[in-house]
Amino acid sequence: MSEAEKKATIASGAEAAAPVAAQPPADSTAVVADASTIAVSTETAQEKAGKDETPAPIAAIAEPAASEAAAAPEESAPAAAAVVPKEPAAASEETKAPAAETAATPAPAAATSAAPEATKEKDAADAPAAAEKTGVAKLWEVCQAHEHKEIWGVTLQDPSSDVPTEIVLTKFLNANDGDVPKAVDQLTKTLDWRNKMKPLELLKKSFSRAKFGGLGYVTNHSEAADSKDPALKEVFTWNIYGNVKSMEETFGDLQQFIEWRVALMELALQELNIAGASAPHTITAENDPYKIYQVHDYKSISFLRQPASVKAASKETISVFSTVYPELLKEKFFVNVPVVMGFMYGLMKLFVAPKTLKKFHPMSDGGALAREFGGSKVKTLGDAMPKEYGGKGEELKATGKETMLD
């Protein structure tokens, strides 16, 4: 073989051995079709989560969630291609000893080079924490510049020393998957809205008993009454739309309905008590116990020919809540719903993130609700549910809190 042929053969072998660059995965964002009907699942929420499936789309006649703002789903980075080196040829008996002596010589240099590598690993591990601190610090600058100084009952202070403020600002970051500019925009809109709406004052406002009596409740269930661990407490909001006496009366005045619904949410936030949080009970994107269960009961509700006022109230409430109450929904249960529903899910898709839709669980049988809470650290939670929802507790009228009514 000529010298040129040898070089060509070597080049060809090297090209074949080169690692192939990993291709980025295809976009895995779930595409939800515009369906006018859905099948209500009989599986529990935990069984659905185990299958890693997006629940069937659902619809409701009124506000379905205090949900997170829409955020792009996380994408997994492609794994780097690895090349497995060929094993070196076995050394002869005559050459083994000299090779060992030669290898022993540069050992100190190898030990020295380990230090920079360890430093790099530490820097890489610290990078996410540093980025999070930078994001919280940026959001704190927004709070300092704004005239309104409160969110969800928390008086905003320096998050480096105030745990409640750190929790609030971290929720805005988490709702936007760490995207600081988006979090800044949502936080600014929330501060503007709270400054105008004054939701804490709505807690002192009396609403019409004829319109809203028996329509909304807040319950608080604790594993230990004196525990400061937020994971040992579960807060619920209940919307009993079957108790609506007149659709037009309840939903016809849009501003009044929104005010009542906001007052109920703020009542739940008082029970959640983020303002009372203290170290070490902070939050991360993966671990956040400061969230609320929501239950909407549609027993005896007809989903045919809903008035325009109901649809308008639904659309406005979803839009408002998805902006100003991010990362506060734990899971949402639609109980006693008909098998076929329609218009509401189309509205949800416009405002609610896909990761939030996965928290929605339609159920045709309200009596099965108590079985959904086996994963809660409040071990008695299922039994604490009212009897009509499969538990052993008293009815909501006896145990739940309502907004002020006259």
UniProtKB/Swiss-Prot annotation:
GO biological process: Golgi to plasma membrane protein transport; phospholipid transport; regulation of exocytosis
Major location category of this protein: cytoplasm
Residues reported to bind heme: Y241, R261, H296, Y298, K332
A Gene Ontology molecular function term of the record: metal ion binding
Matching PROSITE patterns: CRAL_TRIO (PS50191)
Biased composition annotated in UniProt, kind: Low complexity: 11-26, 55-117
Required cofactor(s): heme b
Keyword annotations from UniProtKB, A to Z: Cytoplasm, Endoplasmic reticulum, Heme, Iron, Lipid transport, Membrane, Metal-binding, Microsome, Transport
Chain positions covered by the region annotation Disordered: 1-130
Compartments reported by the entry: Cytoplasm; Endoplasmic reticulum membrane; Microsome membrane
Any one annotated GO CC term: endoplasmic reticulum membrane
Function: Non-classical phosphatidylinositol (PtdIns) transfer protein (PITP), which exhibits PtdIns-binding/transfer activity in the absence of detectable PtdCho-binding/transfer activity. Regulates PtdIns(4,5)P2 homeostasis at the plasma membrane. Heme-binding protein that may play a role in organic oxidant-induced stress responses.
UniProt similarity note: Belongs to the SFH5 family.
Name listed for the protein in its UniProt record: Phosphatidylinositol transfer protein SFH5
Top-level taxonomy: Eukaryota, Fungi, Dikarya, Ascomycota, Pezizomycotina
